[in-house]
């Protein structure tokens, strides 16, 4: 209650979780859907609205399950699709386990509710049975898209994350109880999801797609987030074994589930085997940009078995750090300030959690792997005049500035996730590199207020006074000379001071992950402008990319 910034973080977490807290246990349990609706990453990636005919591409369709469940809204004309009552149709197809089976559903419900007369020419307009609405040779997969971007992401998964965060910042056991209900129901059904065999449409094609509920890259992030959430609420949920077992065992009996949920051990087994062990057994479904998959598996193993598997987890983490920092502190993936930031941001995320377990862990890592420090120096050394990064590979757009540090995201409302500001300060204490403090300070709008935005960190007044000492001594401008990242093959020549600073860069290799084939690519920043702008992320050439 002492600090306004802390109250703000806590209150925001509570506000986000409130809608799920207000739901009945039965309604919460009902949120998780089965796998039998063909899922898709786009309604029609290069398509238009069937009503107003205006372009509605890629991810522009609006899903708001709280206000309009089982509907998408056109952002141009505000019409909602599908036009049939899919919620009623969906429920009519439930089997004895509470899972939708299309062959059991009442197809007499497949009509435009605004035009119920079969003789009306609009009687079937906009009607989707789960496999899309077809007209004039085109298919709009409204429900397949909604299931992921509405129901799963905004109802089920968001509920797990928000409830667990609220529990972490309040200690109120009601949040842990509600989160456990969601996690348990996900545990019932998660192993039955396989994006590749259940539609798996991405850009209107299915070949090569992988995933779980979502496609591979999001599936990887989603299951790791659920592991963090489960870890947060574990003790609070376990303490409510009688209430949880009473409700979940009743549901198990009513829906003829194999796990009776009679005890916390049953519930724990259902969550851990259904979500996390299943993920470990199907790595291909979450295979993503390095090191996201390895990191996800590490987090799952740590959550399930720490500290008994401490040595194995630390060995896996060391392997991740070694590979992620092998190329001048980076993984070697191109796309500077974009894809290349995946590795350092991943390292920061996992290290924030590990330092909570052992405050001396970061020093041990830097002593053993000095390249870990370079992972966060790289995006300092290659940033030009605090506004630009060289356009190397798939990144950015023509002439667009990079106003923020790209090595990780400085978010002031991290709530239960830990603070990147605290992490950078700890890294400074280990390395004595003042540029880390300067970046942290500038990322906080060049002010001390609110630092370190960490509900679980040290006294903020002491933290701020220490940051002030560094800034008073070093200033806010990071003094950088010319650099040559020989392994990453990027050189930057710098000259001038203040408003006359300028930088000439050359990328002297080609290809690589998210790299381009334009060897010896050059650029020049001066007078606040990119005077030799690269085109940035190239045209993809398919779907609705523009």
What are the roles of these predicted feature ranges?
Residues 152, 215, 286, 332-337, ...:
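Alpha-helix N-cap/helix-initiation motif
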Residues 2-7, 11-14, 22, 26-29, ...:
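Extended polysaccharide-engagement surfaces of secreted carbohydrate-active enzymes
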Residues 321-331:
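Histidine-acidic residue clusters that define the catalytic metal-binding segment
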Residues 316-320, 539:
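Active/binding-pocket-proximal capping segment
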